[in-house]
């Protein structure tokens, strides 16, 4: 005697709007949650015209006027560095974030391609909107194209917001410890 297996009910799928009425799973409205971080704003190479807005953002974040430092870093990025990797994020026609970084082919006797993240900032009015993630996403993409293997930075141990952000984008503590000695 034969045993009859149960038969599944027919599967039906809602007809799509594409050719052949298939469903277009790549349609922008269907997968907004998968957008790349760098698509949240216009991220491009930093220019000298961005200086005033970068200084404004940095002053709002640090509470200090670091215009001389920012100016030196921007000049270094524009003229002294063979590879420009510093970026600015624009939204609503204004600079709303920046990342200053530099490519380094080694230090302390090491010869490995490393980038150093000098400073990053996002306008307080645009925090928690993916601007920082967009900047670092584009920075990492650009550095990978240059065959840079690693990005390093230094963070104050009490800057919990920045530490949390850096952990969130994949940074982890290194095996090196920075030492400082005051000279009187």
Question: Where in the sequence are the language-model features?
Answer:
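Conserved N-terminal entry element of GNAT/NAT acetyltransferase domains
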Residues: 3-49, 184
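Acetyl-CoA-dependent GNAT
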Residues: 36-41, 45-49, 56-112, 118, ...
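General detector of folded, globular domains
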Residues: 102, 107-108, 133, 140, ...
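Short coil/turn motifs at secondary-structure junctions
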Residues: 104-106, 125, 158, 184
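Conserved acetyl-CoA-binding loop-helix of GNAT-fold acetyltransferases
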Residues: 122, 128-141, 168
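Conserved beta-strand-loop-alpha-helix junction that forms the acyl-donor binding cleft
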Residues: 127, 153-163, 180
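Conserved active-site alpha-helix within GNAT-family acetyltransferase domains
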Residues: 133, 145, 157-175
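Conserved GNAT acetyl-CoA-binding A-motif
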Residues: 143-155
């Amino acid at each position: 005697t034969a045993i009859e297996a149960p038969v599944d009910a027919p599967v039906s799928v809602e007809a799509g709007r594409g050719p052949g009425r298939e469903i277009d799973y790549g349609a922008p409205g269907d997968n907004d949650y998968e957008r790349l971080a760098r698509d949240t704003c216009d991220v491009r190479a930093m220019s000298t015209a961005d200086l005033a807005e970068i200084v404004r953002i940095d002053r709002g974040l640090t509470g200090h006027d670091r215009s001389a430092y920012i100016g030196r870093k921007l000049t270094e990025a524009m003229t002294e560095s063979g590879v420009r990797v510093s970026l600015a994020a624009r939204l609503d026609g204004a600079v709303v974030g920046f990342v200053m970084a530099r490519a380094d082919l080694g230090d302390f006797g090491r010869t490995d391609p490393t980038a150093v993240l000098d400073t990053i900032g996002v306008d307080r009015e645009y925090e928690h909107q993916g601007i920082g993630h967009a900047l670092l996403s584009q920075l990492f993409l650009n550095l990978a194209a240059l065959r840079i293997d690693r990005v390093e930075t230094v963070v104050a141990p009490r800057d919990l917001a920045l530490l949390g952000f850096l952990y969130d984008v994949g940074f982890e503590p290194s095996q090196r410890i920075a030492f400082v000695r005051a000279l009187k």
